[in-house]
Amino acid sequence: MARRPYRQLFETLILNVLDNVIPMNVEAIRRGVSEKLGREVSWNTIKKYLESLRDDGSVEEIHTGKLLLYKRK
């Protein structure tokens, strides 16, 4: 049996962690995904898949001063 591609795994986990109302930063999303996955996930990995989800239109990017937040659309 083939394993699920990492892209599909991480995008599903990120969408499960994100909220429709409350925006979250990359570190908060990383902690949530790490908790659900049961192992530490790199900040760069989360950022990579967040940018992919943003480009697909599943996630909205919010700029608040120096902070970059994300929420589900």
Residue spans for each PLM region:
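Short alpha-helical segments that sit at the start of domains
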Residues: 1-23
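Short helix-coil junctions and helix-kink-helix linkers
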Residues: 31-41
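Short, hydrophobic-biased segments on the C-terminal half of alpha helices
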Residues: 47-51
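A short, conserved structural fragment
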Residues: 54-64
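Short, cationic-aromatic polyanion-contact patches
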Residues: 7-8, 63-73
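Key DNA-contact positions within bacterial/archaeal DNA-binding proteins
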Residues: 44
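Short acidic, hydrophobic short linear motifs in intrinsically disordered regions
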Residues: 23-33
